[in-house]
């Protein structure tokens, strides 16, 4: 029972502040053309909006007094949702893709790893290049660092080193990220 009450209170807080839901003593009103009409008591501002057949919507409640706009709420809500969809479409969450290899890699296998890494980078993802060692191979970590530096120079056209080659336990790792297009 208590949780039901919590949720209903939360929902009422999330509702948009339009017309009778505006709970401020005074508001600054802007008409549908963008002109400031002045500071009003919410009841008067709502009457102005109703006379025009529109709604009074709180645009910014952070300022003092809060800014309200006289507009068609349905149209306003639609444009807000459209902007949110566009922003979501443009956003790309880059993840880290890993390319694993050994320090004694053959030339063809190395080229395959380079191709994999370049595909990941062109897709906008970061690439973590990892060279693993077994047993006493760890003595040859300098060869692994050289190999990772060669990989960085081969991908220099599309990627930049975010983290230089370094030892991490039984691995040598390097992090590459796509170059910023300016």
UniProtKB/Swiss-Prot annotation:
Biological processes per GO annotation: ribosome disassembly
Pfam families, per database record: IF3_C, IF3_N
UniProt GO cellular component terms: chloroplast; cytosol; membrane
Main location, first listed in the record: plastid
Keywords: Chloroplast, Initiation factor, Plastid, Protein biosynthesis
Subunit structure as annotated in this protein's UniProt entry: Monomer.
Protein name in UniProt: Translation initiation factor IF-3, chloroplastic
